[in-house]
Amino acid sequence: MIELFYEYMFPLTVIALKVVAITIPLILCVAYLTYAERRVIGLMQLRRGPNVVGPFGLLQPIADAVKLLFKEPIIPTNADKILFILAPIITFVLSLIGWAVIPFAKGVVLADINVGVLYILAISSLSVYGIIIAGWASNSKYAFLGAIRSSAQMISYEVSIGLVIVTVLLTTGTLNLSRIIEAQKTLPWWIDLMLLPMSIVFFISVLAETNRLPFDLPEAESELVAGYNVEYSSMGFALFFLGEYANMILVSAMTTTFFLGGYLPPFNLPFLDCIPGFFWFVLKVMLLLFCFLWIRATLPRYRYDQLMRLGWKVFLPLTLFGVVLVSSVLFYTDNLPSV
């Protein structure tokens, strides 16, 4: 019996504890990211933001969660009820399981697999299905049009994201995210400089991938009322909401891992090694999240034709050229990584 416990139950218990240790703090971060967004945008617009519920409004996310929890879930009469309920669950779960391969610090990762990049790309591709199912199951023209827009937008920019990641893989020679971070310790400065335009394209593309301003066309209120989640209320709406903000944090962590050295100190300065890597990882993610909020507060929304033109006629040729340029430079300077 004891052997059975140590062989089967103990590993499963450890995995469950790791999942809980990541999921609960992540949900809290998502909740308070909404608070930070409202406060930051409020300050940028010369107003206070939420400041009534609790000291400095710190209990506002909890109040919002309680309100949504006790609201009546309304399902449209002609909706496909099973798919209608399933869609927000799919979206929220996919936004969480992507964190399994993200290294928070050296050796601190839930699943240190050798195909971590492929895992991330697969999860980001699957998230389209939750949105399509929501638009279809709602039996609403507004929701369906918002879902079609969102899926077309996400698929379009996934191409650019994938090609940018290829340039990173060319310089590091591995699909393991922990090894990608460690490889950035020894990269020459000119390779980092060569990847700088690619990192900018990547960040703009993940803005479109997460449906954030200036690319929040699926939620264009003047055209689609509220997008693919127009028929959702109560916890269904809350799960979509949490999924969107969890994806914001996830893509910020991906950008940190691929281009900012992950948990490594800035510029790989040796005297900063005494500070835990987790601190640097969180700091870099927070700076990128601030950029998300800053962009939302300052930029107007693109038209849909401008959005698609940017993805297919600007970013796709640019990233293809980037892949050819990076591979050629690495080949002729004999800096291709040995696999």
UniProtKB/Swiss-Prot annotation:
GO terms for cellular component: plasma membrane. Disulfide bonds: none annotated. The chain crosses the membrane at residues 10-30, 50-70, 82-102, 115-135, 155-175, 187-207, 235-255, 275-295, 311-331. It is an enzyme of class 7 (translocase). Pfam families: NADHdh. NDH-1 is composed of 14 different subunits. Subunits NuoA, H, J, K, L, M, N constitute the membrane sector of the complex. GO terms for molecular function: NADH dehydrogenase activity; oxidoreductase activity, acting on NAD(P)H, quinone or similar compound as acceptor; quinone binding. Its main location: membrane. Its EC number is 7.1.1.-. It comes from Rickettsia typhi (strain ATCC VR-144 / Wilmington). InterPro entries: NADH_UbQ_OxRdtase_su1/FPO, NADH_UbQ_OxRdtase_su1_CS. NDH-1 shuttles electrons from NADH, via FMN and iron-sulfur (Fe-S) centers, to quinones in the respiratory chain. The immediate electron acceptor for the enzyme in this species is believed to be ubiquinone. Couples the redox reaction to proton translocation (for every two electrons transferred, four hydrogen ions are translocated across the cytoplasmic membrane), and thus conserves the redox energy in a proton gradient. This subunit may bind ubiquinone. It is a multi-pass membrane protein. It is found in: Cell inner membrane. This is NADH-quinone oxidoreductase subunit H. It catalyses: a quinone + NADH + 5 H(+)(in) = a quinol + NAD(+) + 4 H(+)(out). Keywords: Cell inner membrane, Cell membrane, Membrane, NAD, Quinone, Translocase, Transmembrane, Transmembrane helix, Ubiquinone. GO terms for biological process: aerobic respiration. NCBIfam families: PRK06076.1-2, PRK06076.1-6. The keyword Translocase applies. Belongs to the complex I subunit 1 family. The keyword Translocase applies.
